[in-house]
């Protein structure tokens, strides 16, 4: 069976707040009026996930009519400039030869389609011109495989009928809204290193001196100001995914996130190595296709490092996306444990992706008074809460700049940092073992203001320090 057309997508979610302004990287998924929407974590049938949550790999017969792979979409779309852009997911067990043959077939079909169109399609400067394949995704053997590109509706229908195809999803705009500065002092590090915080504990971070030594943390975001003094030479540029963009963070969001993970003064894992993976343009916008390409890059880089487990941070998200959740789950299976933001809509996090990812650590935001932050998403998809209101960290503008901002985007790197911190102490741990440890170490039943009846775990991040 194919994925149901319902239960797949819901409203978009912003992930970082600056003053009263949402300032995360919300994914704005596309809308398709003929697809039903529901705001729950999608439960796919056994044709797609086995008992371990892995993508299953049944051999499908060729599609026909209603058996075509679903064309997925979501509500509250911003598809500006993305007409006819799609992301295609293939069976994960395809051989290298089958995968290559499939992409060759798509390219050939696309060229034949272009040749058959009106003259306007021959003008590559025309907005109607279809450019074909853009990204090809291959996370490794029996892992996430697929591609993205711009195709006519005729080619999309042919793709949906191909037996290798699991799903087709419309590409989506990812963006960060205007940033504003808030006043406030750092307190998050003190909170995650004390089971209960007394007045004298404010500003005191208790931690093991190893603090993420020799652990890699990938910041999948707007980039990182890698020469900031707070990174002490431990930050490097990994990849710039958006075509034609620069190897810089001209936004600030990614640099702030990286600082909470591993900077000298503001970081949880003060010896971890930061790798910048830019998936959002300096303007603060990007596409879902580029985000998935960034996740793929982290998997490939991690595998080449020879390390058993690395850490990833995604302080971005939006409407529920089967494709993004599947990609993130595959990354975790391949050894990159991702911390992802729950979202800032004061709504069910299961409405959002990658918050609905089963294998990532989904993080809600808490306040200095141990309350669930007024903006934080909640629900059964949230795994843990961490400090997310008035968080001081590194910033752009100079190599010493700082900024204080808020959101689940700020809570998430506390948990990514904790993951690196734990791996520094337990380098043989697998990605799933890291997630289990983070949850096991958490402080139970200290948070206030969690919505009654929301199935939300009352768990606050803690580094396990002995006071």
From Swiss-Prot:
GO MF annotation list: endopeptidase activity; peptidase activity; serine-type endopeptidase activity
Q: Does the keyword Protease apply?
A: yes
**Record domain Peptidase S8: where:** 186-467
GO biological process annotations for this chain's record?
A: autophagy; conjugation with cellular fusion; zymogen activation
- A Pfam family (short name) is Peptidase_S8
Entry keyword set: Hydrolase, Protease, Serine protease
Q: Does the keyword NADP apply?
A: no
Residues annotated as the enzyme's active site: 221, 253, 409
* Gene Ontology, cellular component aspect: extracellular space; fungal-type vacuole; fungal-type vacuole lumen; Golgi apparatus; late endosome lumen
Which parts of the sequence belong to the Inhibitor I9 domain? Answer: 86-176
Which Gene3D superfamilies does the record associate with it?
Answer: Peptidase S8 propeptide/proteinase inhibitor I9, Peptidase S8/S53 domain
Per the UniProt record, which EC number(s) apply here? Answer: 3.4.21.-
Q: Which family does it belong to?
A: Belongs to the peptidase S8 family.
- What protein name is recorded for this chain? Sexual differentiation process putative subtilase-type proteinase isp6
Taxonomic lineage: Eukaryota, Fungi, Dikarya, Ascomycota, Taphrinomycotina
Q: Which gene produces this protein?
A: isp6
């Amino acid at each position: 069976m194919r994925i149901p057309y319902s239960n797949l997508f819901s409203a978009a979610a912003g992930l970082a707040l600056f003053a009263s302004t949402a300032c995360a990287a919300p994914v704005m998924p596309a809308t398709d009026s003929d697809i039903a929407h529901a705001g729950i974590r999608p439960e796919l049938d056994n044709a797609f996930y086995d008992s371990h949550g892995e993508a299953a790999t049944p051999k499908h017969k060729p599609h026909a009519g209603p058996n075509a792979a679903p064309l997925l979409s979501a509500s509250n779309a911003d598809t500006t400039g993305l007409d006819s852009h799609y992301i295609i997911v293939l069976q994960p067990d395809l051989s290298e030869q089958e995968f290559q043959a499939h992409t060759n077939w798509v390219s050939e079909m696309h060229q034949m389609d272009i040749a058959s169109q009106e003259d306007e399609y021959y003008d590559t400067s025309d907005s109607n011109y279809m450019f074909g394949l853009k990204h090809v995704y291959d996370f490794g053997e029996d892992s996430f495989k697929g591609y993205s590109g711009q195709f006519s509706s005729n080619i999309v229908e042919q793709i949906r009928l191909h037996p290798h195809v699991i799903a087709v999803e419309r590409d989506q705009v990812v963006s960060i809204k205007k940033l504003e500065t808030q006043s406030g002092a750092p307190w998050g590090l003190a909170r995650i290193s004390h089971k209960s915080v007394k007045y004298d504990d404010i500003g005191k971070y208790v931690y093991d001196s190893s603090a993420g030594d020799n652990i890699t943390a990938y910041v999948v975001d707007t980039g990182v100001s890698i020469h900031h003094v707070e990174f002490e030479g431990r930050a490097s540029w990994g990849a710039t995914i958006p075509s034609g963009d620069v190897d810089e963070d001209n936004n600030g969001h990614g640099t702030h996130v990286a600082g909470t993970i591993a900077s000298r003064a503001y970081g949880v894992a003060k010896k971890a190595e930061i790798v910048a993976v830019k998936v959002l343009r300096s303007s603060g916008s990007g596409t879902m296709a580029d985000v998935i390409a960034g996740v793929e890059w982290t998997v490939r880089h991690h595998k080449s490092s020879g390390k058993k487990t690395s850490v990833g941070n995604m302080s971005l998200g939006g409407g529920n996306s089967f494709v993004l959740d599947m990609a993130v789950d595959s990354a975790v299976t391949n050894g990159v444990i991702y911390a992802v933001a729950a979202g800032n809509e004061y709504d069910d996090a299961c409405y959002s992706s990658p918050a609905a990812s089963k294998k990532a650590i989904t993080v809600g935001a808490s306040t200095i008074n141990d309350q669930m932050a007024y903006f934080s998403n909640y629900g059964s998809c949230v795994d843990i809460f961490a400090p997310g209101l008035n968080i001081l960290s590194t910033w752009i503008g100079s190599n010493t700049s700082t900024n204080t901002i808020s959101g689940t985007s700020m809570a998430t790197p506390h948990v990514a940092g904790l993951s690196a911190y734990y791996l520094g102490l337990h380098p043989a741990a697998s990605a799933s073992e890291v997630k289990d440890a983070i949850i096991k170490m958490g402080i139970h039943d200290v948070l206030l203001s969690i919505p009654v009846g929301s199935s939300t775990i009352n768990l606050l991040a803690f580094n396990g320090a002995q006071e």
